[in-house]
Amino acid sequence: MKLAELRSLISDRKSEDLQTIIVELYKKIPKKTIEEHRMDELVRDPGSYAGLAKALKSEPQRTLDELEPDIVEFVADAKNQYYFAPNSIIRKKDRPKWRFIVKRFIHDLQLTTDTPEDTAKAAELLEQLYALLCEATEHILFSTDDPFRSVGIAQERLYSIIVQMLRRDAPPKKWVAKAISLAIDHSLGRDSLHETLWLALLDHLNTAPLKELAIEEAERFLAGAKAQLRLVTKKSRDAWNKERALSNKIESLTELVLYCRFALSEYEEGAQFFLQHDPASSREVTYFRLLLRLLRADQKDLWLRFYQQAIREGVPVRDSLTKANQTITETGRLPAYL
């Protein structure tokens, strides 16, 4: 069938029919073809796929030795704002092409993992690109404030790709610690939360020992962050920024332990840990955040227990929590949302 005939046949199809066609066609595509041609990106963002496909076809597959100096140079140029501000290094017409350069790098690096050494190096280079995109969410490096969206890849997706590479060869303790560090040491994109990164990490923590190891490493990072926070003196704006960053890190690590405990079906242990370590400015906020997560985990009995505990402690509770408690009392079920 020619493309013109195909377009004609599908032009008036119902959306349900198109979904069926796409899913069945996707099932028939070999995994290698999906990866090489970034077919998942076509599904996620059809609008930008034409530019990506053009970039992928523009030059042959490069080796890791060829990629490394190009990536190092690109990262340095980007940090110098050569892809944003007027300069004599990157021509004006080439500056908007940075997104296609990054797409190509990410694509090529995933195809250069034939040996453990190559995998480790590819992961390291991907980490540099990840860190750059994270930095570009807070500082002007490109003509966008949402670099992950511009590149056409979700932050948690790129994070997951890196974690997958890290775990191929590194000992569990090493790659788990690296994965946690990668999440807490870099900024979040506009559409990202630490929660989405932790859920991506949990996909790789597919055994109980790995989840327990993640708890151990998260608690180690947490102790370090709390020790640093105690040393911050509140005498300058820089100190305020540092305090805020450390508090965010503590909040994120506390959340990771909670999710790992929940994944181990240790709901009460996770909830108690969260209450003890969450750095929110008030107990009202901490209890709300905990009860929200217990609701998502469908833990009705624990939800009621901690709601009643908050009342006994004299903690003000939000109207949404009061209504949720009423719903449980009347129906015996948790509400769908708060």
Please describe what each predicted stretch is.
Residues 1-38:
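Basic helix-extension-helix modules of the SAP/HeH family
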Residues 34-338:
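Eukaryote-biased, non-catalytic alpha-solenoid scaffold regions
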